[in-house]
Design a protein with these regions (language model features):
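N-terminal membrane-targeting hydrophobic helices
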Residues: 1-164
Length: 164
């Protein structure tokens, strides 16, 4: 919808998507480095990916610390705000791709409960997160996929109208 009002390049679209998924991928970097360096088995990556709170695989303290702080920093509105200000002054054309990161933070704040990886959006001031609805609850997943299908159909219909 934004592209109907502002010209967005394919590079910007790619940047939006990349920055939308980056916060959840970034925390794997220390684990990948540790595994690649021979410190742990490859299975740790899978175990970490499917872990529930309290059931994460045992990692060396430095790896655990880096994973934790990368997760917090990547999900922080304060960190994203500081980066956005820097980008605004140094590379304003990169502001559109930052929408991906901001959308990730906003969605995570409301789709993570206190019991299931709360999103620390005010890090480094506090680790507390908003007690939202856990994204893995059945009712949320059903609602989510129904809304995605409805939006996809709406975009398909409006795109056909614009094209003709």
């Amino acid at each position: 919808m934004l592209s109907r009002h502002v010209r967005i390049t394919k590079k910007s679209y790619c940047g939006i998507v990349l920055l939308a998924v980056l916060p959840d991928i970034l925390e794997y970097v220390p684990i990948v480095v540790w595994v690649a360096g021979g410190g742990g088995p490859m299975a740790v990556l899978y175990q970490f990916a499917i872990a529930t709170p309290g059931a994460e695989p045992i990692l060396p303290p430095i790896v655990q610390l880096l994973v934790h702080h990368l997760h917090c920093a990547a999900h922080s509105a304060i960190v994203a705000g500081a980066v956005t200000l820097l980008v605004w002054f140094l590379r304003p054309r990169w502001l559109i791709p930052l929408l991906g990161w901001w959308s990730h933070i906003i969605f995570d704040v409301f789709t993570h409960s206190q019991d299931y990886y709360p999103s620390p959006f005010l890090y480094p001031i506090t680790y507390r997160g908003f007690d939202g609805v856990a994204w893995n609850s059945p009712i949320f997943m059903l609602t989510n996929y129904l809304l995605l299908a409805a939006i996809w159909l709406w975009l398909l219909r409006t795109h056909r109208r614009v094209a003709s």
